[in-house]
């Protein structure tokens, strides 16, 4: 039909757009293996698929390797590195179905060469978004972040990707932990007091595991734990149990009294306590800014700001003009209300920032909004005081005289 005469119809979508925060953020893991010719980065849809890939990468007597073959290879020294140790542990404990980037550092007997390979493997993760079209939100490095040079590259990569991670302090006491923790200052990194112990099914023995790696995996598990509201990404890791047998370093924890964990908490160090299982205790960053020391708070506002970017992108260069800006504002407002309803936030408001949205800015098509909001606080201390009084003596009289 002609568009000049007759009936013409069309439709358009008007109003706020939905904003979604993913509960299954990609994870990047740096592991070491002698089964690669050079450093190499891989992508998998899950950790299980990653493990199967590396098992099937080589054959034994013309057949696909089994876990028994892996155990034999580790025992005779033909398999070196920590790749299988950690991937097998992960698949034994959890089903991690998230986009998974594995950056493999080539194993070397030369410690300096191995260190260089690990640093390069960490640095290469910055290219994961362009290579695999995924943006790692969590980065884990098994075993090696106690080295200051490796730790610095790790933190630099985390900041480049606006991700988050953990640092293994591997301390023997609180004083050493405090000294090591002072070497770092980042709102995206959580220092960990000591490593963890668990049964290694590949060596049939108790083994030491990097707390950095285990908490990186655990962060994914907690993210996916809320299947109803899907806001597990806003949960703290503190006071949650880990599927491990023990911590390498004992920390005195006395419920209701002062103990060793208080000193560690005051110095923004996460520890592990034994209370009805092995639990994560404290979840802070090592930032110097008090407002950025709550790792949960940092993650919440990170995720909110990222989610809004995708939602308001369609309004850029819109032919609707100022109506598009109004719809963008409605989109952000509805998102904040949704987060309040899901108890991630306790309140919030959005307004046009007129100090920045000047007449000149409007002429250039630039509009600025301020969102004033607060995260739902997590109780870290609940004090209870019992006071002995005699104001209930009347009950005694009534009991005797009844």
What kind of region is each of these model predictions?
Residues 2-22, 26-36, 41-45, 55, ...:
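A glycine- and small-residue-enriched flexible loop/hinge signal that marks low-structured segments
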Residues 4-5, 148, 326, 330, ...:
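Conserved structured core elements
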Residues 37-44, 48-95:
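N-terminal assembly/attachment segments of tailed bacteriophage virion structural proteins
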Residues 56, 259, 334-338:
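Short, intrinsically disordered, mixed-charge
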Residues 69-76, 88-120:
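Acidic/glycine-enriched edge-of-secondary-structure segments
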Residues 153-154, 328, 350-351, 383-387:
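Composition- and surface-driven signal marking solvent-exposed, interaction-prone regions
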Residues 291-356:
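Acidic, low-complexity glycine/serine/threonine-rich segments
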Residues 356-402:
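C-terminal edge-of-domain segments
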